[in-house]
A protein has these predicted regions:
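N-terminal secretory signal peptides and thylakoid transit peptides that target proteins
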Residues: 2-20
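N-terminal Rossmann-like NAD(P) cofactor-binding module of classical short-chain dehydrogenase/reductase
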Residues: 107-108
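N-terminal Rossmann-like dinucleotide-binding module
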Residues: 16-84, 163-166, 258
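Short amphipathic alpha-helix with an adjacent loop that forms part of the alpha/beta core around
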Residues: 95-102
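Short acidic-hydrophobic, aromatic-tinged amphipathic segments that line or gate anion-handling sites
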Residues: 88-92
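Glycine-enriched catalytic-core subsegment of oxygenase/oxidase enzymes
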Residues: 36, 56-58, 62, 70, ...
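Beta-strand-loop-alpha-helix segment that lines the small-molecule cofactor/substrate pocket
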Residues: 112, 117-165, 179
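Predominantly a Rossmann-like dinucleotide-binding segment in NAD(P)-dependent oxidoreductases
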Residues: 32, 49, 53, 57, ...
Length: 492
């Protein structure tokens, strides 16, 4: 494997402005003139993280020129490389930006969660349109940063929560705003995930790094640890340093109609509860409560938006079925579900907002007021990329909306990881800080449950970390201290 680690952050910043002068690929904005592109013009798109979801995203973008592919695991990415044999291959996205930055119009990001923010942020500072898989970022701060960078650089953006482009989310919003179920003060949501391992202790020993992988680049901004096949591919979702557990993986799909339909902003109170809170791995099962204050009544809505409590569940548990639930009907629809508890009725939908229905059995007759997406989620982003900022119709999940929404999602992760404080946490959204964690408070986390069964009798010998400052730990969860050599652009 070629060693690409010599390409440093310093090299990237020093050379980006003058890179790629010798390449023959010309970005379509140069051909098209002042930023607006005819629909027939093709974008030059690069993919970062192309072995899993990224491959599917790029296949839905094959109407355009896929000019570069970047991944840290070339064995896992081989199928995508074969899909686009003319695309130049890279290990390091920084080197790709350096060498081909001026030749690329747009970036698709589908790395492990912990790298979403840094890859997308630097792409936008270069003026690139970005499509980022869910969850949008690993932290609250990264979400806020991407929101502001998108606004500053006027690029087309989309998070990869494809249900936001579908019919169900729009119907739910229209039903809510038309007063079909009354005011909503309670929402319950769940997923049947995780499908990957969680609740694990960190492997005691590392393994040799495969020749087809650059492990240092996979680690990226996270704290370094030895390679183990338990971490990637796919399983990164269950490890805190790389993923956000079942909540982060699925709430961007399942809670989207909640965020949009109830016009949510920052939560002000949060709590989490789960099975063992391990140091390195997300729990097998968790419950999170987020409380949002009353919001102003919107012009398009007949209802008020009072304080609302949103409860999330995962790991196999579901809300209790309300009175009137059809006997024998599963609540799990396509991997999860939501119940909007209104003062007059209830809306139930599946994951991605699919197949909404009213508990009463009534079928709402509501005028369609929200524009519908006629093409795929990815193609709608491509459409937005080709429109000038002044005349652009936003995508179904632009960062102006996906950024604040993702802050809500990863706030649930914070609630779970801080549950050892044994209290409801108070959140100041604009300042991105908890207001009721005191300087002297400490936390400790389980390293190993030490479960043993001897003669049919179970025993536990749990091992814990040394106590850490709760305030410092929370601050790092909100805004990570990146590994040396890795950094984000400044907050606008």
């Amino acid at each position: 494997m070629k060693n690409s680690n010599k390409f440093t952050r310093r090299n990237f910043l020093a050379t980006t402005a003058t890179a790629a002068a010798g390449f023959s690929i010309v970005p379509s904005n140069v051909i098209a003139g002042l930023g607006h592109k005819a629909p027939s013009d093709k974008l030059n798109i690069a993919g970062v993280g192309v072995g899993g979801m990224g491959r599917g995203n790029l296949r839905n973008m094959k109407s355009e020129n896929i000019v570069a592919l970047c991944d840290v695991d070339w064995a896992h990415s081989d199928r995508c490389f074969k899909d686009f044999p003319d695309a130049k291959k890279f290990w390091d996205w920084r080197k790709m930006y350096d060498e081909m930055g001026k030749s690329i119009d747009a970036i698709m990001v589908a790395t492990a969660d912990h790298s979403h923010g840094i890859v997308a942020a630097h792409a936008m500072t270069l003026g690139k349109h970005v499509y980022v898989q869910k969850p949008l970022t690993h932290t609250v701060y990264e979400s806020r940063l991407l929101t502001k960078l998108a606004d500053k650089h006027k690029v087309a953006t989309s998070m990869g929560n494809q249900g936001s482009s579908a019919e169900g989310v729009r119907l739910i919003q229209e039903w809510l705003w038309n007063d079909e179920i009354g005011e909503v003060t309670k929402v319950e949501a769940f997923t049947d995930r995780p499908l990957w391992p969680q609740g694990l202790a960190k492997p005691a020993e590392g393994m040799p790094v495969p020749e087809t992988m650059n492990w240092d680049l996979f680690i990226g901004p996270a704290k370094f640890r030895p390679y183990h096949r338990m971490y990637t591919p796919w399983n990164f979702r269950g490890w805190w340093d790389f993923g956000t557990g079942a909540l982060g993986d699925m709430a961007c799909h399942i809670l989207h109609p909640v965020f949009m339909g109830l016009k949510l902003g920052y939560p002000t109170r949060v709590q989490g509860s789960s099975t063992d809170v391990m140091t390195d791995s997300a729990p097998n099962t968790e419950i999170v409560k987020l409380v949002f204050p009353a919001r102003p009544k919107a012009a398009e809505s007949k209802i008020n938006f009072p304080e609302v409590e949103v409860t999330w569940m995962d790991g196999g548990i579901q809300p209790m079925k309300p009175i009137g639930w059809p006997e024998g009907k599963s609540m799990n629809d396509d991997g999860g579900g939501v119940i909007f508890h209104g003062t007059k009725d209830k809306i139930i939908c599946g994951c991605y907002g699919v197949r909404p229905w009213l508990l009463s059995g009534r079928e709402p007759k509501v005028q369609k007021t929200i524009p519908r997406i006629k093409d795929s989620h990815e193609q709608d982003w491509i459409r937005a990329c080709k429109e000038s900022p002044e005349n652009r119709t936003e995508t179904a999940s632009p960062f102006s909306q996906a950024g604040p929404f993702n802050e809500m999602v990863v706030m649930g992760v914070l609630a779970v990881r801080l549950q050892g404080l044994e209290k409801e946490l108070l959140w100041d959204g604009p300042k991105m800080e908890f207001t009721n964690i005191r300087d002297r408070e400490e936390l400790k986390f389980c390293l190993d449950t030490g479960l043993k069964i001897v003669d049919g009798h179970p025993s536990f010998s749990r091992k814990y970390t040394d106590p850490v400052s709760a305030k410092e730990f929370a601050a790092d969860l909100i805004k990570h201290n990146y590994r040396e050599g890795w950094s984000l652009p400044a907050m606008p």
